[in-house]
Amino acid sequence: MKERWRFLIEGSVQGVGFRNSCRRRALDLGLCGWVRNLKDGVVEIQAEGDELALNELRLWCERGPSAATVKRVLLSKIPVTGNDWFDVRT
């Protein structure tokens, strides 16, 4: 069953390639959705797919790309929207 999760990634996560790395990982996992930087320094991700793939993305987010320092990952389940792509938003 398809689910949609919202991730808020806190730490040193902007300007380190987090969004593009996240997009690649999400596509590898067969997920749809988007990722963007927020003005407060947080990275927001909304991803949609099966629970196992979403959990794998969560595990990846806890580490992030090598240049990132992840302090905390906040997660919430949100309504499925039916996206069929994964985009980097500005």
Curated annotation (Swiss-Prot):
Species lineage: Bacteria, Bacillati, Cyanobacteriota, Cyanophyceae, Synechococcales
* Reaction catalysis annotation: an acyl phosphate + H2O = a carboxylate + phosphate + H(+)
Residue ranges annotated for the Acylphosphatase-like domain, each copy included: 4-90
Q: Does the entry feature the keyword NADP, yes or no?
A: no
Q: Which GO terms describe its molecular function?
A: acylphosphatase activity
A Pfam family reported for this protein in Swiss-Prot or TrEMBL: Acylphosphatase
Q: What is this protein called?
A: Acylphosphatase
What is the scientific name of the source organism? Synechococcus sp. (strain CC9311)
State the NCBIfam families in the record.
Answer: PRK14452.1
**Which SUPFAM superfamilies did the record assign?**
Acylphosphatase/BLUF domain-like (SSF54975)
Tell me its EC number(s), please.
3.6.1.7
- Listed PANTHER family: ACYLPHOSPHATASE (PTHR47268:SF4)
Q: Which UniProt keywords apply?
A: Hydrolase
Active-site feature positions = R19, N37
Similarity-based family: Belongs to the acylphosphatase family.
